Amino acid sequence: MSVRYPLLNRELGILGFNERVLAQAADPQVPLLERLRFICITSSNLDEFFEVRMAGLQEQIRDNPGALTPDGMSLQHAYDLVVERAQRLVHRQYTMLHETVLPALEQEGIYFHASDSWNDEQLEWARRYFLDELLPVLTPIGLDPAHPFPRVLNKSLNFVVELEGRDAFGRQAVMGIVQAPRALPRVVRMPHALSGFEHGFVLLSSFMQRFVGELFPQLVVKSCNQFRITRNSELFVDEDEITNLRVALQGELPARHLGNAVRLEVSADTPLHIVRRLLEESELGDKDCYRVAGSVNLVRLMQIPDLVDRPDLKFTPFTASTPAVIANAPTMFDAIDAGDILLHHPYESFQPVLELLQQAARDPSVVAIKQTIYRTGTDSPLMDALMEAARNGKEVTVVVELLARFDEETNINWASQLEAVGAHVVYGVVGHKCHAKMMLIVRRVVQAGKASLRRYVHLGTGNYHPRTARLYTDFGLMTADQKICEDVHHVFQQLTGIGGELTLHELWQSPFTLHPRIIESIRAEIDNAQAGKRARIVAKMNALLEPSVIAALYEASQAGVKVDLIVRGVCALKPGVPGLSENITVRSIVGRFLEHHRIYYFHAGGAEDVYLSSADWMDRNLFRRVEVAFPIRERKLKRRVIAEGLSVCLGDNQSAWQMHSDGHYRRRRTGKTIRNAQLGLLAKFCS
């Protein structure tokens, strides 16, 4: 593939984002237990990176080794660069954990007891715990011709045990494998009286390394080392052949745990000949092995902040606010009738969204509810409200995206429950994930003695997920605007029925009008700049990768348009290149909350067009998903979006990272006045 304009590598960009996340763990301004949490978040992110992106890169190398990446590199060269950077990131992560965070936790009375440090009383307690709580659940597998190497599950914790001696059948014992069931706790609290610390913990791996011999009686344990294999987790569903997507997915999900191996993690002290055996059994090369100084699964340490009652070592709790127009209105419908409502999560509560749906479920005047679901969690009051509405006789239609990655099983379960109470459940459009966030309520109202149907809509940039609504930054709009409601009705009509493309008047929708409208809006700014008028583009999103949009932004810069991009994650555009992109800046905000809203601002000759959306500027969002972008017309709300979503990020000099033309980021901590976008909004909205 020839590249007309320069692009940056996607995989390297994802690793760059995770480097910025890990930097939070090194920041002394971040509370200590939150620093530990950021180390764990980095591990979780890397797991998905290997399961999806690295797995895909390995497949491309196998299938088409001569191909190039979108940024023009050979696949093998790109893979080598990504592996090298990933290895550095993992090394930095474990160094930070062991040399900075764990010693600081020990100073605060939070300690992890390694097995080689146990005194006699601690040893006896640990032995009893192993025999009573762990041993009955563990299954040792001895390796011999009758017991081949097991195909260990994706991301499971395993132990490879080197043995010596003969077993009860006279067989020479060489090696055994023990897989730790997911039900076993990875972290166990040691009784306070034994620990000597306020909060003492023992890792499951410490129990195993000390007592694994109990699983192999009368044999000598020469070594016991933990390992973990990450597998390709993409689901393979032939969308052209299936007749029932849910049934096809249910058949495919179990295979996710047994896909091709893409990464081997082993403890640093694992003997080389054992590492070789593990790589051979996994069909991996030396570059795919990550030797780590400690636990091979740091994600499980994420529970420590929840187990330790030390508010002084965590982010200050906050109570999200509720807009006065909602608090003072008899019902959510009355509040929306008074005018459009903008909610800015997590600073403003997600509860009004739940209340809107709950009131709709119980209101005898409501006749129909339509809802999209992408991610909502396993325990969702929103889904409970939809089922209540169906039981109450409402016409409930839910578009459940079954292919939401890693939420497929949860969404299948919700779809079954919804159908059981009489709701209409559809799975969107085969070949196009439904990522749009839409709720439509149809209510019978009486005005001046005349009955009519009135529509109410909620549109959002984030998922209908109460838990992540406290962790992600997102905007939501509640409106009864007739044009927007009509457009949302048409989108639902497309999702649930069959027919031609319907004309939308206010919304931009992918895969139809969203990409053309973005390009047209950029072109309009170019025209204004060339005519000597003011021209400006500000856009905020999670990722920027789509080549034609990037090309248009480069052309805008060359025409003199000032372009400010706030891209949390990967960005393939190179800013600040003379003659190409010197008028473009790119920054990334990484802080307490995950920046998640997508905002498109175009100066538009002074009209200032502002759109909110669920769509990043990526190929998949613009061409292979159903997404919507919706306008903010009301002046006061528009000023809020510009101020709270864009200006605070552009002015941030604490959690902002500035991207340079080589693709590297540097923390932007300049100026005498401290400006932190998220902390400023917390202070403005929350108590």
Curated annotation (Swiss-Prot):
It catalyses: [phosphate](n) + ATP = [phosphate](n+1) + ADP. The active site is at residue 435. GO terms for cellular component: polyphosphate kinase complex. Disulfide bonds: none annotated. Keywords: ATP-binding, Kinase, Magnesium, Metal-binding, Nucleotide-binding, Phosphoprotein, Transferase. Its cofactor is Mg(2+). ATP binds at residues 45, 472, 568, 596. GO terms for biological process: polyphosphate biosynthetic process. The keyword Phosphoprotein applies. Its EC number is 2.7.4.1. Mg(2+) binds at residues 375, 405. Coiled coil: none annotated. One of its GO terms (molecular function) is polyphosphate kinase activity. InterPro entries: PP_kinase, PP_kinase_C_1, PP_kinase_middle, PP_kinase_middle_dom_sf, PPK_C_dom2, PPK_N_dom, PPK_N_dom_sf. An intermediate of this reaction is the autophosphorylated ppk in which a phosphate is covalently linked to a histidine residue through a N-P bond. HAMAP family: Polyphosphate_kinase. NCBIfam families: poly_P_kin (TIGR03705), PRK05443.1-1 (NF003917), PRK05443.1-2 (NF003918), PRK05443.2-2 (NF003921). Catalyzes the reversible transfer of the terminal phosphate of ATP to form a long-chain polyphosphate (polyP). Belongs to the polyphosphate kinase 1 (PPK1) family. This is Polyphosphate kinase. It comes from Burkholderia cenocepacia (strain HI2424). The gene is ppk.
